[in-house]
């Protein structure tokens, strides 16, 4: 299982060891399935590229703790920014900080991280929710892992709606150290 916050900022390397860039964001399709990773826009000389670059998830050979490995430079695609509608934290529709509500209107928190399997075409497995910095420090963040076949979940542009019964499956992580943006 992978957490999005853990792969942001990781180096992307070719199988021969050549540096390709760093992970800037995760890109999702309209069903919130991971499509690929967006690379930073900086060149080795510090210049900024005009068009974003991305690597499709199926072209990532391995997603490790400290780096992502890709086959070669041909798998790096230059894409139009308009294609990057749904991302974790930089797109038009951002999953990070999106509010999660039950269908009965109870606020469960905001998304601070997302869990998914590293295999291609995997749906989101769960969310880490925050109630604010102080609640995170004193009580821990809450995790909402989705059932095997999540039904009745609405992944909207402004909020995520879940059945009221999902409130019972929230767990608090009291051991999670909250130190900054990456939690």
Give short role names for the model-derived ranges.
Residues 1-183:
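Peripheral interaction segments used for macromolecular assembly
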């Amino acid at each position: 299982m992978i957490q999005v916050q853990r792969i942001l900022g990781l180096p992307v390397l070719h199988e021969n060891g050549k540096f390709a860039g760093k992970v800037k964001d995760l890109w999702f399709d309209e069903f919130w399935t991971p499509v690929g990773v967006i690379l930073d826009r900086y060149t080795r000389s510090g210049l900024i590229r005009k068009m974003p670059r991305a690597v499709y998830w199926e072209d990532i050979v391995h997603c490790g703790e400290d780096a992502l490995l890709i086959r070669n430079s041909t798998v790096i695609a230059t894409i139009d920014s308009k294609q990057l509608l749904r991302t974790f934290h930089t797109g038009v529709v951002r999953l990070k900080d999106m509010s999660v509500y039950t269908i009965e209107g109870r606020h469960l928190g905001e998304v601070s991280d997302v869990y998914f399997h590293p295999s291609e075409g995997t749906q989101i497995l769960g969310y880490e929710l925050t109630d604010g910095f102080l609640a995170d420090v004193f009580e821990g963040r809450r995790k909402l892992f989705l059932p095997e076949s999540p039904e009745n979940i609405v992944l909207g542009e402004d909020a995520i709606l879940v059945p009221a019964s999902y409130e019972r499956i929230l767990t608090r992580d009291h051991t999670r150290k909250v130190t900054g943006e990456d939690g």
